[in-house]
Protein backbone atom coordinates (compact mmCIF):
# COMPACT_ATOMS: atom_id res chain seq x y z
CA UNK A 1 0.00 0.00 0.00
CA UNK A 2 1.48 3.35 -1.06
CA UNK A 3 1.94 5.92 1.67
CA UNK A 4 0.07 9.19 1.19
CA UNK A 5 1.56 12.50 2.26
CA UNK A 6 0.79 13.13 5.90
CA UNK A 7 -0.98 14.61 7.79
CA UNK A 8 -3.64 15.08 5.09
CA UNK A 9 -3.36 11.35 4.27
CA UNK A 10 -4.95 10.33 7.57
CA UNK A 11 -8.34 9.62 6.04
CA UNK A 12 -10.86 7.02 7.24
CA UNK A 13 -10.14 4.97 4.08
CA UNK A 14 -6.36 5.01 4.60
CA UNK A 15 -6.65 4.15 8.30
CA UNK A 16 -9.09 1.31 7.59
CA UNK A 17 -6.60 -0.21 5.13
CA UNK A 18 -3.52 0.29 7.31
CA UNK A 19 -5.14 -0.87 10.56
CA UNK A 20 -7.07 -3.76 9.03
CA UNK A 21 -5.85 -7.18 10.09
CA UNK A 22 -3.86 -6.00 13.10
CA UNK A 23 -6.03 -3.52 14.95
CA UNK A 24 -9.48 -3.61 13.40
CA UNK A 25 -11.68 -6.71 13.58
CA UNK A 26 -12.85 -8.04 10.23
CA UNK A 27 -15.81 -6.06 8.95
CA UNK A 28 -14.96 -2.98 11.04
CA UNK A 29 -13.87 0.26 9.42
CA UNK A 30 -12.79 3.72 10.49
CA UNK A 31 -15.70 6.06 9.75
CA UNK A 32 -14.28 9.32 11.07
CA UNK A 33 -10.89 10.66 12.14
CA UNK A 34 -9.82 13.88 13.80
CA UNK A 35 -6.18 14.83 14.25
CA UNK A 36 -4.58 16.83 17.07
CA UNK A 37 -0.86 17.59 16.85
CA UNK A 38 1.15 16.56 19.93
CA UNK A 39 4.25 18.30 21.18
CA UNK A 40 3.99 20.94 18.48
CA UNK A 41 7.38 22.53 17.95
CA UNK A 42 9.21 19.93 20.03
CA UNK A 43 9.58 17.15 17.48
CA UNK A 44 12.76 17.42 15.51
CA UNK A 45 12.76 14.91 12.68
CA UNK A 46 9.18 13.65 12.77
CA UNK A 47 5.73 14.99 13.56
CA UNK A 48 3.37 13.35 16.04
CA UNK A 49 -0.41 13.55 16.26
CA UNK A 50 -3.20 11.94 18.22
CA UNK A 51 -5.85 10.49 15.93
CA UNK A 52 -9.34 10.23 17.45
CA UNK A 53 -11.22 7.46 15.66
CA UNK A 54 -14.88 6.57 15.18
CA UNK A 55 -15.80 3.17 13.82
CA UNK A 56 -18.45 1.45 11.76
CA UNK A 57 -18.97 -2.16 12.80
CA UNK A 58 -17.76 -4.00 15.89
CA UNK A 59 -15.59 -1.60 17.90
CA UNK A 60 -15.93 -3.38 21.24
CA UNK A 61 -12.63 -3.21 23.11
CA UNK A 62 -10.95 -0.96 20.55
CA UNK A 63 -9.20 2.16 21.79
CA UNK A 64 -10.75 5.23 20.21
CA UNK A 65 -7.42 6.92 19.61
CA UNK A 66 -4.00 6.05 18.23
CA UNK A 67 -0.77 7.99 17.98
CA UNK A 68 0.66 8.68 14.53
CA UNK A 69 4.33 9.46 14.04
CA UNK A 70 5.15 10.54 10.51
CA UNK A 71 7.76 12.29 8.38
CA UNK A 72 8.35 15.92 9.26
CA UNK A 73 6.56 18.50 7.18
CA UNK A 74 9.67 20.69 7.54
CA UNK A 75 11.85 19.96 4.47
CA UNK A 76 15.14 20.64 6.31
CA UNK A 77 14.25 18.30 9.17
CA UNK A 78 13.10 15.66 6.70
CA UNK A 79 16.41 15.93 4.81
CA UNK A 80 18.42 15.49 8.02
CA UNK A 81 16.26 12.51 9.02
CA UNK A 82 17.00 10.90 5.67
CA UNK A 83 20.74 11.63 5.97
CA UNK A 84 20.84 9.68 9.24
CA UNK A 85 18.35 6.96 8.20
CA UNK A 86 16.11 7.90 11.12
CA UNK A 87 12.84 6.86 9.48
CA UNK A 88 14.26 3.46 8.56
CA UNK A 89 15.61 2.97 12.08
CA UNK A 90 12.27 3.91 13.68
CA UNK A 91 10.23 1.57 11.50
CA UNK A 92 12.70 -1.30 11.75
CA UNK A 93 12.90 -1.01 15.54
CA UNK A 94 9.14 -1.31 15.83
CA UNK A 95 8.99 -4.23 13.38
CA UNK A 96 12.14 -6.20 14.25
CA UNK A 97 13.47 -5.30 17.70
CA UNK A 98 10.47 -4.27 19.79
CA UNK A 99 9.14 -7.87 19.84
CA UNK A 100 12.49 -8.96 21.36
CA UNK A 101 12.52 -6.68 24.40
CA UNK A 102 10.65 -6.72 27.70
CA UNK A 103 10.94 -2.93 27.95
CA UNK A 104 7.55 -1.21 27.93
CA UNK A 105 7.01 0.25 24.49
CA UNK A 106 3.74 1.24 22.91
CA UNK A 107 1.98 -1.43 20.90
CA UNK A 108 2.70 -0.87 17.22
CA UNK A 109 -0.31 -1.30 14.93
CA UNK A 110 1.19 -0.33 11.56
CA UNK A 111 4.48 0.84 10.11
CA UNK A 112 5.21 2.04 6.62
CA UNK A 113 8.35 3.37 4.94
CA UNK A 114 8.71 4.68 1.39
CA UNK A 115 11.66 6.81 0.32
CA UNK A 116 11.49 9.99 2.46
CA UNK A 117 8.07 9.20 3.90
CA UNK A 118 7.16 7.03 6.89
CA UNK A 119 4.37 6.44 9.35
CA UNK A 120 4.02 4.52 12.59
CA UNK A 121 0.56 4.03 14.09
CA UNK A 122 0.84 3.03 17.72
CA UNK A 123 -0.88 2.74 21.06
CA UNK A 124 -2.00 6.01 22.62
CA UNK A 125 -0.09 6.40 25.87
CA UNK A 126 -0.96 10.06 26.44
CA UNK A 127 -2.61 9.18 29.76
CA UNK A 128 0.81 8.26 31.12
CA UNK A 129 2.64 10.97 33.03
CA UNK A 130 5.40 12.65 31.06
CA UNK A 131 8.46 13.92 32.90
CA UNK A 132 9.30 17.59 33.18
CA UNK A 133 12.72 18.49 31.77
CA UNK A 134 12.92 21.69 33.83
CA UNK A 135 11.83 20.29 37.19
CA UNK A 136 13.27 16.80 36.84
CA UNK A 137 11.91 13.43 37.84
CA UNK A 138 10.87 12.07 41.20
CA UNK A 139 12.79 9.16 42.71
CA UNK A 140 10.02 6.73 41.70
CA UNK A 141 10.00 8.05 38.10
CA UNK A 142 13.79 7.79 37.94
CA UNK A 143 13.77 4.21 39.24
CA UNK A 144 11.10 3.22 36.70
CA UNK A 145 13.06 4.83 33.85
CA UNK A 146 16.28 3.05 34.88
CA UNK A 147 14.48 -0.30 35.15
CA UNK A 148 13.01 0.09 31.64
CA UNK A 149 16.33 1.26 30.17
CA UNK A 150 18.05 -1.75 31.74
CA UNK A 151 15.51 -4.07 30.09
CA UNK A 152 16.03 -2.35 26.75
CA UNK A 153 19.82 -2.50 26.87
CA UNK A 154 19.91 -6.05 28.23
CA UNK A 155 17.78 -7.21 25.32
CA UNK A 156 20.27 -6.02 22.73
CA UNK A 157 23.69 -5.80 24.38
CA UNK A 158 26.20 -7.23 21.88
CA UNK A 159 23.30 -8.79 19.94
CA UNK A 160 22.71 -6.21 17.20
CA UNK A 161 26.25 -5.46 16.05
CA UNK A 162 25.55 -7.30 12.79
CA UNK A 163 22.55 -5.07 12.01
CA UNK A 164 23.87 -2.38 9.71
CA UNK A 165 20.94 -0.05 10.40
CA UNK A 166 21.57 0.04 14.17
CA UNK A 167 24.09 2.81 14.84
CA UNK A 168 27.27 2.05 16.73
CA UNK A 169 29.38 4.53 18.61
CA UNK A 170 32.50 4.52 16.44
CA UNK A 171 33.15 3.93 12.75
CA UNK A 172 29.49 4.29 11.87
CA UNK A 173 27.86 6.03 8.95
CA UNK A 174 26.83 8.64 11.52
CA UNK A 175 30.45 9.55 12.20
CA UNK A 176 31.02 10.03 8.47
CA UNK A 177 28.04 12.38 8.24
CA UNK A 178 29.35 14.66 10.99
CA UNK A 179 31.74 16.46 8.60
Q: Model-found features: residue ranges?
A:
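Conserved ATP-binding subdomain of kinase catalytic cores across diverse folds
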Residues: 36-179
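Juxta-kinase regulatory segment immediately upstream of eukaryotic protein kinase catalytic domains
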Residues: 1-34
Amino acid sequence: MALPEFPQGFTPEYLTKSLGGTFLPEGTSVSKVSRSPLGEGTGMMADIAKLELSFEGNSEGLPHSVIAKYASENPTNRQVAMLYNLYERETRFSEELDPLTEARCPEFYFTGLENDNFVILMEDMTDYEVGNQSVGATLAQTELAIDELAKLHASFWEKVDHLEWVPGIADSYHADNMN
